[in-house]
Structures are given as C-alpha cells and as structure tokens.
C-alpha cells in the first residue's frame, strides 16, 4: 500500500512539473497580433474601434491596412489574409467562387452605411432624387458633373446594384478613390460626388438629402443619411457592411470581430453616424423633410 502511494505521489509530481513547465498560449482572442484590411470608406470608424479595443486589451497589436473593396475580398477568398472589413456584400461571381471552393471565410454583417451625394458647401442644391442620380451616372443628363471612385471600390459596385441596373456608369468621371472624389468636388463647383458616409462627414462638403421618384410610394420625402434611417431601411441608398474572417482557432481576429459586434463596438459605429446591425440602439427622433 505504501509502495502504491509512493508511486502515485511521484506520478503527480511528474504531471505537475510537465504541465507547470508548459508555456501559456502565445496568442489568444485578446493577446497577439493581427493584420486587418479595411475598406477605404470605413477606415476612420474602424480605426476608432481598433483604438478602443487596444486600450481595453493592451496585449493586442492590430495593423490596419486601407484597401479597395475588390482587393480585400479577392485576398480573403484566396486565403491570403485573416480579416477584411468590407463596405459591400459579395457579388454574384464572388459568391459562386465562395461556394465552388467551399471557402471557410466567415461573413458577418455589422453595420449599415450610406451612399452619400456631396456638393460644394456653397452649392445651391440641397436635395436630389435617385432617378436624377441614375441619369447623371448613365450619361443621360449633363446638368452636373458626377464623380465616383474606380471600379475596384465598394462605391462603384454599390452604384451598379442600387442605381444603374448593373450598367456601367459611363456618364461619371471616374477617379482613383473617395478622397480624390472629395478633392474634385471642392474644385469643380458644378459637380456632385458619391462617397461613403465616413468620408462625407470628414469632407467639409454639403451632404444632400436623397429622395426617390416623386411618383413612388415615398415620393416627395427626402432623407438625410442619419443612423436611424440607415438601420430602419428608409434612406434610399443604404449598403450593408461586413466583416470577413478567415481564422482557424480563436485569436485576435475573433476577439476584434466580437468587439466590433458588441454593444461597445456598435456604440462607436453609431458615433460615426452609421447604423448598428448587431445590437438594438436608441436613436434620436428625426423629422422627415420634403
């Protein structure tokens, strides 16, 4: 009996030494490094969320890299990157590739953004309907010059889906990115630019209220791109934004995703004027304008 107890005691010591010598995991959801691609439209907001996350979890180091929507999605579907925050959903071709390759990339909707029409701060225009924007984009109207970012941007793809019936916007002046759209509109006083809400809010340009055709059910009502109208679907040019995550195990990518979709992350989304998609948020009452 004593011999058995002695052997058991030695075994316990060996197990204690073995497990005691094992190093704790180097990376967890709140400890480690992450490279995260971010759509240019969403960069200011995501940067603020990253700063908040890093303050709460100081053992994380997140590098944000600004890219176009198409570039980010292609890299994710090819398995080249861990995380991308996108201003648009996958196109039909991208969905087919996703299904064909049995991709393990997780896709999580986290907020609602607005396609915004901006003009010079002194421009007489205050509102516009979607039909007018469509005619400008297709070249059927020359009343204003209209600037949009290039075909790799989320804006370009969103416009094809939401406004031009998948036709190329041959009437638009296509520039490098959303920042360039802002620069062109500031120089060209008789122009309209189409950018994401984050970019519009930082541009010091006038943001137009958007309405639908006067003959439609909601005709005559114009909406500003306020968070409440984005979340409830009333703003005419809404786009859902997504997190694409390609991470095996639970590491910083998973932790950052959880934070973005948590009440803390969604409050930051709201503070930037976008509509939260994962938690219920109270909004200030907004009066519709005609």
Report each predicted region and the residues it spans.
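Bacterial N-terminal signal peptides
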Residues: 9-18
